[in-house]
């Protein structure tokens, strides 16, 4: 199988073909996802909650991300693999570059960082040094203590305009992908249409170029609170492989996420 690349996703955007992505943390699930046609994966700092059992993503280290990135890469050698730079791992451009090198040596194709226009210098430096960057706007879980919890972001004209401005700034600095989390559908549509780069949504409606889900949410392994945007595909299919195939099919057809999974 040919490797999936950033150019592959750019082509999807140009052809208006929605694509599905998922978080992965280990060899076995990565292998299964790849075998069923999920060719874009994220080693997310969500592992702090789903794998390590913390109540936030903040305790996750660069070493944790690198460890899981290496495992996922062994399971899915041809996938486009994104890896989060965790909390306080990119407070300066130099620190970001050093930590990006660590996770890319472990097998990542691209790093994801959370934040707006204040990251422009960092994004530019990484891009100039051959480190592809995925931005992340909206609900950025590393900022949970600022937000006062996990809440929808970008409601109201001023907040929406700010997110659009941030998205354009990240793109201009060289970001090649953008994740939009927990924002109103109307804003997600504005941002997706304004950017030339592919936009991946989670809790942003079905108007983005792609979708991502935390794998545990896709299989109903939530341990309590179920996010509004989550759907348990395993409950409907009774089989993990069939659940993955249904997730892909519903994303590509625009069935998922539906109105019941979206914010306004």
Curated annotation (Swiss-Prot):
Reactions catalysed according to its record: 3-methyl-2-oxobutanoate + (6R)-5,10-methylene-5,6,7,8-tetrahydrofolate + H2O = 2-dehydropantoate + (6S)-5,6,7,8-tetrahydrofolate
Domain of life: Bacteria
Alphabetic keyword roster: Cytoplasm, Magnesium, Metal-binding, Pantothenate biosynthesis, Transferase
Oligomeric form and interacting partners: Homodecamer; pentamer of dimers.
Record-linked NCBIfam families: panB, PRK00311.1
Binding of 3-methyl-2-oxobutanoate, residues: 45-46, 84, 112
Residue sites binding Mg(2+) per the record: 45, 84, 114
Protein name, as recorded: 3-methyl-2-oxobutanoate hydroxymethyltransferase
An annotated Gene Ontology molecular function: magnesium ion binding
Top EC class, one word: transferase
GO cellular component: cytoplasm
CDD domains named among the record's database cross-references: KPHMT-like
